[in-house]
A protein has these predicted regions:
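Gly/Pro-enriched, hydrophobic low-complexity segments
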Residues: 133-197
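N-terminal leader/targeting segments and the immediate start of mature chains
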Residues: 12-67, 195-197
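Flexible, processing/modification-adjacent segments and terminal tails
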Residues: 49-51, 97-156
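Positively charged n-region of N-terminal signal peptides that target proteins for export
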Residues: 1-5
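Short, exposed beta-strand/loop patches in secreted or surface proteins that constitute
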Residues: 38, 64-68, 88-89, 133-141, ...
């Protein structure tokens, strides 16, 4: 067990070295590794977020609350009013929307099945295991934030799927996340509240 943890930490360090860390400096890289370790150890989290999904010809904006416990995520839409109360339950690779017994399906935003209801689980998975391409400390509104860009190291920058996460540098809470496909932002999450255990 100890040997696998050591190998995992070494691989993350090599990933940052190979990716250059994006000019964020050693402090940003070390903070990114610390935050990754915390998210790997996290048992559960709760969040309030605004999710914007861009399908190209139409854009949808949802407000939701999320409770993630292990491999299960329970998401409840709180706005717009027409869908408030709609619940999404995601367990491992399966997900469905339900409301008073009715099940609703949403369309994919990107190859691989990314949908608005899978946004928060996808962002959390990236926080835990995404390839760290760029790590930069910057101001995000009034918050000192760590911006981490994750992408497939085999793809050119701006092609394929790229995920950008912003963490509060002091609390390590996730404050924002974006998923882009071939250089176009298809999904954005703004967190007004995020707690983890």
């Amino acid at each position: 067990m100890r040997r696998s943890l050591l190998i995992c930490v070494l691989m993350m360090t090599l990933s940052l070295s190979a990716g250059g860390g994006g000019g964020g400096g050693r402090e940003a890289e070390e903070l990114a590794l610390t935050i990754r370790g915390e998210y790997l150890a996290m048992m559960s989290c709760a969040a309030q977020a605004v999710v914007t999904a861009d399908y190209g010809q139409r854009v949808y904006r949802y407000e939701l609350s999320a409770a993630v416990n292990g491999e299960e995520a329970l998401l409840t839409l709180t706005a717009p009013e027409t869908v408030a109360g709609l619940t999404a339950r995601i367990e491992e690779d399966e997900g469905w929307l339900e409301y008073d017994g009715a099940i609703l399906e949403t369309g994919e935003l990107a190859p691989g099945g990314l949908t608005p209801m899978g946004a928060i689980p996808a962002l959390l998975e990236t926080a835990r295991s995404g390839y760290l391409d760029t790590c930069v400390l910057e101001e995000l509104g009034e918050v000192q934030a760590l911006r981490v860009v994750s992408r497939d190291p085999e793809e050119k920058q701006g092609s394929g799927t790229e995920t950008t996460l912003w963490f509060d540098a002091a609390t390590h809470a996730l404050v924002r996340g974006e998923i882009s496909q071939d250089g176009v932002c298809v999904l954005q999450c703004e967190f007004s509240q995020f707690t983890k255990e």
